[in-house]
Design a protein with these regions (language model features):
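A structural signal for short, hydrophobic/glycine-enriched beta-strand patches
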Residues: 1-115
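A transmembrane-helix-recognition feature enriched in membrane-embedded lipid enzymes
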Residues: 111-135
Length: 135
């Protein structure tokens, strides 16, 4: 979230969409009070999506948001570990031009189990699309 906020330029033409947020998330409390984001910047430039529960749904939720806003390209910000699968799904589902921007999640060493889990999810995602769309 902080990296996305930092990408909003001073002209405030860039928008930050945070998808897959829990229904209890209060943007004013978290973004303004806890993270000390500028209230004016939050109000003009940050929107929150509460509908998605996984990466697949994040891509769809972002697609609908972008269509509504007439946006055709996005900067996809997520962790380095999660980026390959997120980028794949966003490219397959969103219909947007996707530029990846991976951020380090402050872990010096990522546990092997976590890397394996993410790799398996990526392989399964690709298998689903190959089977479903015969790509």
């Amino acid at each position: 979230i902080i990296e996305g906020y930092n990408q909003i330029d001073s002209s405030k033409e860039n928008k930050l969409f945070i998808s897959g947020v829990d229904n209890t998330f209060n943007s004013e409390v978290v973004l303004i009070n806890m993270l000390n984001f500028d209230q004016e910047k939050v109000e003009c430039c940050i929107e929150v999506g509460y509908l998605s529960k996984n990466t697949y749904e994040n891509a769809l939720e972002t697609r609908y948001w972008a269509l509504e806003k007439k946006i055709n390209s996005i900067l996809l910000i997520t962790s380095t570990l999660h980026m390959p699968r997120a980028e794949f799904l966003f490219n397959q589902l969103s219909g947007l031009r996707v530029t990846p921007h991976a951020v380090n999640n402050n872990q010096q060493v990522i546990p092997f189990e976590k890397m394996l889990e993410e790799y398996i999810k990526l392989v399964i995602s690709k298998m689903v699309f190959i089977k479903k769309y015969e790509i």
